[in-house]
A protein has these predicted regions:
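Gram-negative bacterial Sec-dependent N-terminal signal peptides
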Residues: 1-22
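Pre-active-site segment of Zn-dependent metallo-hydrolases
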Residues: 29-31, 54-101, 112-115, 167-171, ...
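Beta-strand-turn-beta hairpins that frame and shape the catalytic cleft
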Residues: 31-37, 50-56, 149-158, 188-195, ...
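Active-site neighborhood of phospho(di)ester-bond hydrolases with catalytic His/Asp-centered motifs
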Residues: 58-59, 96-105, 125-128, 195-201, ...
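Active-site environment of divalent metal-dependent phosphoester hydrolases
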Residues: 64-65, 105-110, 132-134, 150-151, ...
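Active-site-proximal loop/helix segment associated with metal-binding centers of metalloenzymes
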Residues: 65-71, 77, 159-192
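Active-site HxH/HxHxD metal-binding segment of metal-dependent hydrolases
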Residues: 67-70, 87-149, 161-166
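Cap/insert and terminal regions of metallo-dependent hydrolase folds
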Residues: 201-290
Length: 296
């Protein structure tokens, strides 16, 4: 089954080296006020993360509004994706990018437009060899598997786990296969804040473990609460998980992304803003609009 196209899959259902600075420890030099981590919300789950002079592009979906059919057997599948246009051109999005991280190859994280826009020799990290082989077959020549951790441009990136849906969903083989695997990533550099990008996962023990092990000061959650037809649970996080993250990492800033851009997201930014205000955690949670940048 070709994991590049989630719509088809759902219709069926219903390298790595560590530098001395990082060796042997997850405890790094305390953040320096002059060392800023920059995060730009591009659209959907696509974000740019910069540690100093090193910039990563995460999960690029760069197509024009309405390019693809809605994901079949999901919430609002009659709508075409993406729901909105980018705030800047794909050329502007990829400008200054040093490496790409594809947490998994579902269409809303790795699409044809991204494949067309990106240089074929750009360093690109995937979660496993299956995804790496797919992306190599698309013409990319510098694809690396993030089996555990790696160092790139002075930044340590570490793979974390999760599950892209509920146990009920994964008990159905025809659904478990297309949902597949998806990774999260922890970013660390001496003197900079640690950032944990959870990826397409629901709240699992792996999320707790990542927070306990790495003590992130910034946590990026895919919080659009994507829903499938016929199932109660979501396939990514939602508002209650944003609250849970704020409780699990009491000193961290929470950034909510993967919202308002593809059909099966059931939680809007406005609804999440109302929720976090009701919970009294609005000062802890950033919900950036497309194109907006944050500095940590």
């Amino acid at each position: 089954m070709n994991l590049r196209t989630l719509p088809l899959a759902l219709s069926i259902a219903c390298a790595a080296a560590t530098t001395t600075a990082f060796a042997g420890s997850n405890v790094l030099k305390a953040p320096d006020a002059s060392h800023k981590v920059d995060l730009q919300q591009i659209r959907n789950a696509t974000v740019k993360i910069s540690y100093g002079a090193t910039t990563f592009l995460i999960d690029p979906m760069l197509a024009k509004k309405g390019t693809y059919p809605g994901f079949e057997n999901t919430y609002r599948s009659n709508l075409r994706n993406p729901l909105v246009d980018l705030t800047e051109s794909p050329t502007e999005v990829i400008s200054g990018v040093d490496a790409v991280i594809v947490t998994h190859t579902h269409l809303d994280h790795w699409d044809d437009a991204a494949q067309k826009a990106l240089p074929k020799d750009i360093p690109l990290f995937t979660q496993h060899e299956e995804d790496a082989q797919l992306i190599r077959s698309q013409g990319f020549k510098n694809v690396r598997v993030l089996t555990d951790e790696a160092e790139f441009g002075g930044v340590k990136i570490t793979k974390t786990g999760g599950q892209h849906g509920t146990d009920e969903m994964y008990a159905v083989p025809a659904l478990a296969k297309p949902l597949g695997e998806a990774m999260g990533v922890v970013f660390q550099a001496p003197g900079y804040k640690t950032l944990y990008l959870a990826g397409d996962t629901i709240w699992r023990k792996e999320v707790d473990q990542a927070i306990e092990q790495y003590h992130p000061e910034v946590i990026v959650l895919n919080a659009g609460k994507a829903k499938m037809t016929g199932y109660e649970g979501a396939i990514i996080m939602g508002e209650e998980d944003v609250l849970r993250a704020s409780q699990a990492a009491k000193n961290a800033k929470i950034v909510a992304v993967h919202m308002d851009a593809v059909n099966h997201m059931s939680l809007t930014r406005e609804e999440l803003r109302t929720y976090v205000k009701k919970q009294g955690i609005e000062s802890r949670v950033d919900i950036p609009e497309d194109g907006a940048s944050l500095e940590f």
